[in-house]
């Protein structure tokens, strides 16, 4: 059985945000049934860097936005692999945000 409700893994995503972004003040993590997004919420950038996991039907889409353009997009049917990719993009986002 494939999990399709991201909200069931709310604690997992919250802990991921805390572990990667604990030293960064201006980040947020929003979680709903159909998506989870971690983003830079500083007022400096009108189009902030973010990483997002979305459910679209039977597919899971992971987006990595570097603040300038869509840097990466990953689409897959397997929830566990989508979570792994979300984690990789989150780590990448944390590294980039820590430079500024």
Map each language-model feature to its residues.
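Ser/Thr- (and often Asn-) enriched beta-sheet segments in non-cytosolic proteins
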Residues: 28-30, 35-38, 52-54, 59-61, ...
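Short amphipathic C-terminal alpha-helix that caps PH/PH-like domains
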Residues: 82, 86-90
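Short aromatic-glycine-(Arg/Gly/Cys) micro-motifs in beta-strand/loop hairpins
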Residues: 45-71
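Negatively charged, low-complexity tracts enriched in Asp/Glu with abundant Ser/Thr
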Residues: 1-45, 69, 99-100
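A short, exposed loop/beta-hairpin motif centered on an aromatic-Gly-Thr core
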Residues: 67-81
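Short, Lys/Arg-rich amphipathic alpha-helical interaction segments
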Residues: 92-100
């Amino acid at each position: 059985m494939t999990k399709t409700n991201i909200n069931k893994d709310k604690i997992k995503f919250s802990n991921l945000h805390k572990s990667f972004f604990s030293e960064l003040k201006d980040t947020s993590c929003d979680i709903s049934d159909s998506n989870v997004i971690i983003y830079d919420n500083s007022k400096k950038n009108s189009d902030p860097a973010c990483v997002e996991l979305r459910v679209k039907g039977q597919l899971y889409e992971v987006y990595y936005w570097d603040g300038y353009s869509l840097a990466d997009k990953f689409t897959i049917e397997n929830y566990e692999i989508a979570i792994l990719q979300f984690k990789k993009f989150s780590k990448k986002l944390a590294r980039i945000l820590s430079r500024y």
